[in-house]
C-alpha cells in the first residue's frame, strides 16, 4: 500500500530524500511519531523534515514500520541506530546494539564504547566496558587507543579492574600514547603518570625507561 502511495498523508524528508507514509501507521509503531502527530505543529503538515537523519536509515526504518523487518549491517549500523533512537523504535535499537555486541574486538571496542555512550545504549556500554577491561593489554596496542584524548586515557588506565600482565604494560602504553603526538601530548605525561601504579614497577626498569624516553 505504501509503495503505491495509496492514501499516504505524510512525506518524511531527510537530506532531500523523501519517503511517503501514513501518519497512523507511523504513530502506531513509534512514540516519537505519535507525539509529533497528536501534539505538535507537525500534526497538520504533510511534509516533515527530519534533521540529522541519514536518508538510507530513514528508508530502512519506514520500511521496518510497515514490515517489521530490518537488516543491520556493518555499513548501516552507525546511521541506523541514531535514527532508531530518535524515532524511539526500541526493537531496531536493540538489534543494532546486539549487532555491535557481536562485533566486539580489541581493535574496535573503544569506538563501540564511545558510540554506545553517545546514544544511551547502557547494556551495550556495560558489556563493552567489561570487554575492554578483560582485553586491556590487546586494546592498548590498537589504533583506537592512540586516538583517545587525555581524559579518556586517564579514565581508561585508572580502572582497578583492568587485566594486564604487569603494570609495565600500562606504563609503556602511556609513553607510547604521548610519543604518538609528543608536541601536543608531552604536557599530559605528569597527569597520566598519576594513574600508573609506579610502586609496582622495579627501580631498574624505571631507570632504563627514563634513560630511553627522556
Q: Where would I find each of the regions flagged by the language model?
A:
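Canonical BTB/POZ domain core
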Residues: 2-108, 121, 133, 150-183
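BTB/POZ-protein C-terminal extensions
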Residues: 114, 118-214
Amino acid at each position: 500500500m505504501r509503495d503505491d502511495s495509496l492514501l499516504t498523508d505524510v512525506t518524511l524528508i531527510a537530506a532531500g530524500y523523501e519517503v511517503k507514509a501514513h501518519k497512523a501507521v507511523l504513530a502506531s509503531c513509534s512514540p516519537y511519531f505519535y507525539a509529533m502527530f497528536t501534539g505538535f505543529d507537525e500534526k497538520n503538515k504533510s511534509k516533515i523534515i527530519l534533521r540529522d537523519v541519514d536518508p538510507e536509515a530513514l528508508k530502512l526504518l519506514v520500511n521496518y514500520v510497515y514490515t517489521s523487518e530490518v537488516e543491520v549491517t556493518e555499513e548501516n549500523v552507525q546511521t541506523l541506530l541514531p535514527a532508531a533512537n530518535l524515532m524511539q523504535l526500541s526493537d531496531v535499537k536493540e538489534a543494532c546494539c546486539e549487532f555491535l555486541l557481536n562485533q566486539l574486538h580489541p581493535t574496535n571496542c573503544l569506538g563501540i564504547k564511545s558510540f554506545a555512550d553517545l546514544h544511551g545504549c547502557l547494556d551495550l556500554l556495560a558489556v563493552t566496558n567489561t570487554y575492554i577491561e578483560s582485553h586491556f593489554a590487546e586494546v592498548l596496542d590498537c589504533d583506537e587507543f592512540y586516538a583517545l584524548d587525555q581524559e579518556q586515557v586517564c579514565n581508561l588506565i585508572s580502572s582497578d579492574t583492568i587485566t594486564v600482565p604487569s603494570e609495565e604494560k600500562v606504563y609503556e602504553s602511556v609513553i607510547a600514547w604521548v610519543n604518538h603526538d609528543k608536541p601536543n601530548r608531552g604536557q599530559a605525561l605528569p597527569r597520566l603518570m598519576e594513574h600508573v601504579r609506579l610502586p609496582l614497577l622495579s627501580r631498574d626498569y624505571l631507570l632504563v625507561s627514563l634513560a630511553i624516553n627522556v
